[in-house]
From Swiss-Prot:
Domain ABC transporter: residue ranges: 3-237
Keywords: ATP-binding, Cell membrane, Membrane, Nucleotide-binding, Translocase, Transport
SUPFAM superfamilies: P-loop containing nucleoside triphosphate hydrolases (SSF52540)
Keyword ATP-binding: yes
Cell compartment(s), UniProt: Cell membrane
Disulfide bonds: none
Pfam families in the record: ABC_tran
EC number: 7.6.2.8
Molecular functions per Gene Ontology: ABC-type vitamin B12 transporter activity; ATP binding; ATP hydrolysis activity
Organism: Halobacterium salinarum (strain ATCC 700922 / JCM 11081 / NRC-1)
Annotated protein name in UniProt: Cobalamin import ATP-binding protein BtuD
Catalyzed chemical reaction(s): an R-cob(III)alamin(out) + ATP + H2O = an R-cob(III)alamin(in) + ADP + phosphate + H(+)
């Protein structure tokens, strides 16, 4: 059952909250809504489930305007897990979950309702709380109870507003695994406002980036979560890479500050794990960093991938001389303002032949003095200031 949002405008108390929002959620898909605080994510979900009447535009569920449906009819099609997990009355956990069956049942319920409620509680890990007063639970436990209530509602469309906000890491993963399974195995259309960009990228098929009440971008996580889009939507500087364990996009926030290396183009020669601390310091300082040559799968290679740096790699045991990687590295070096070479990396066969002296070069590490191929020798913790200074100083050649 598809959910289609077209030209949605929402004004509250004379303030425009949403402006011309378009989105389409298909069966079997989990769509994440991401954006900064106050962007309009919660308002969008409340308009989707009919709680807020839009100023303009439509929300169609299976072709019917959700705002024209009765409350019971809308609840049979759309279930919602709110951000606020507070419950005002002293119901037991089971009674709260049973409320999800109200759109489907008569006053007395059926054996089917009982089975659906039991399964929902087991699936969300709250069955052990069934007889407890829901107000006695922690915020995270209550959040899981509300998810169980939504599952018991058995609606083909599920909306979740920050479903992991009150949960510890274990239950964040468990909750999103349940939600992912609802889309995959039960073909539900799921929309979730998610604060954590890494979790959103890992579990969602598509992301909708909302900022200032508008959709800034929408699509697959890898196409949407780019440094430029995140900068525009969140006003944040980030590095975007790939998690080696999950293969999902990862977003690493970086300090937005001025440093000696800010906006300087630096090529870092790698090998093993020698370049990793250098790359991390330079990326955090705002430098534009490329890396290579590194060996595929080693620590420097994974670091470059995770922080989103362009990287030239070679297969293990490959001779560097006269390879495509050597040519690519020479091009990166020629385009850089400064080269940073860990002393250990310079010992790799073929690396010294890449250092022509045409670009100012830093040796990074411990040595008795600057090697003949470098303009300066610095410790790793001084590489940022050294890059800034050397970028303004012509190389003497080597």
């Amino acid at each position: 059952m598809t959910l289609d949002v077209t030209g949605l405008d929402v004004e509250l108390a004379g303030t425009r909250i949403l402006d011309d929002v378009h989105a389409s959620i298909r069966d079997g898909h989990l769509v994440g809504v991401v954006g900064p605080n106050g962007a309009g994510k919660s308002t969008l979900l409340r308009a989707m489930n009919g709680l807020i009447t839009p100023t303009a535009g439509t929300v169609l569920v299976a072709g019917d305007d959700v705002h024209a449906l009765s409350s019971a009819a809308a609840s049979r099609r759309i279930a919602t897990v709110p951000q606020d997990a507070s419950v005002s009355f002293e119901f037991t956990v089971r009674q709260v979950v049973e409320m999800g069956r109200h759109p489907h049942t008569t006053r007395f319920g059926t054996d089917t309702d009982t089975a659906v409620v039991d399964r929902a509680m087991a699936r969300t890990g709250v069955a052990q709380f069934a007889a407890r007063d829901v107000t006695s639970l922690s915020g995270g436990e209550r959040q899981r109870v509300l998810l169980a209530r939504a599952l018991a509602q058995a609606a083909p469309v599920l909306l979740l507003d920050e479903p992991t906000a009150s949960l510890d890491v274990n239950h964040q993963i468990r909750t999103l695994e349940v939600v992912r399974d609802l889309a995959d195995s039960e073909d539900r259309a799921v929309v979730a406002a998610i604060h954590d960009l890494d979790l959103a990228a890992r579990y969602c098929d598509e992301l909708v980036v909302v900022a200032d009440g508008r959709v800034h971008d929408a699509g697959a996580p890898r196409s949407v979560l780019t440094p430029d889009t995140i900068r525009a939507a969140f006003d944040a500087r980030v590095a975007v890479g790939t998690d080696p364990a999950t293969g999902a996009v990862t977003v690493t926030p970086l300090p937005d500050r001025t440093s000696a290396a800010a906006d300087t183009s630096v090529h870092v020669v790698g090998g093993g794990d020698s370049a990793t601390p250098v790359v991390r310091r330079l990326v955090s300082a705002g430098a534009s960093v490329s890396v290579g040559p590194v060996v595929e799968g080693d620590t420097d290679h994974e670091t470059a991938r995770r922080v989103g740096c362009p990287c030239t790699s070679v297969a293990p045991f490959t001779r560097l001389e006269d390879t495509t990687a050597a040519s690519a590295t020479r091009a990166d070096i020629a385009a850089a303002d400064v080269i940073a070479v860990p002393v250990a990396a310079a010992a790799r066969p073929g690396v010294r032949g890449l250092l022509t002296g045409a670009v100012p070069t830093l040796a990074v590490g411990d040595a008795a003095g600057a090697p003949e191929w470098a303009d300066r020798l610095v410790a790793c913790d001084a590489v940022v200031s050294a890059v800034g200074a050397l970028a303004d100083t012509p190389s003497d050649g080597v």
